[in-house]
Amino acid sequence: QEKYQQVAVFHQDHIQKQNWNEEWEKSYEPIVVEDKCLIRAEFHKIEKVYPYELIITPKMSFGTGHHQTTYLMVKGQMEIDHRNKRVMDAGCGTAILSVLASKLGAKKVEAFDIDEWSVSNGTENIEVNNCTNIHHQTGKLSELHFMGKFDIILANINKNILLDEII
């Protein structure tokens, strides 16, 4: 009978100090959707004015416009009349869709996410975009209570999660 030995190999390198945020910022590009909406971080320089500008710094949250689903949500959302509408943003992440809903004229936006980091980051993005009509909170749809009906429901999250929450 053979005996197996487990071998652990450790290696140590010294890495020069560098500003990792600066390195990340170099590779983080702004996004333009349909030549109508600029999605950028605060550190990006504005080179052209667009009808809608969203300042989104993602930190640890999902929703920058770089992912195809977010890009498509923003593109589709710009085709919907939001004026004086009540909007729900389920699984809001960075609050990118909430901010756009506000800028498109929504009367009130209810945004929520199960992740506390996302809600914290989303709150920062809501504030930097001066969106005062967004109510933002942590929790699942089944745990939160909303009064009245919504005209628009936005949900850039997994289909199975949605089905689990609404059935």
Language model features: what each stretch is:
Residues H44, N158-N160:
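Short glycine-rich anion-binding loops that position phosphate/pyrophosphate groups of nucleotides
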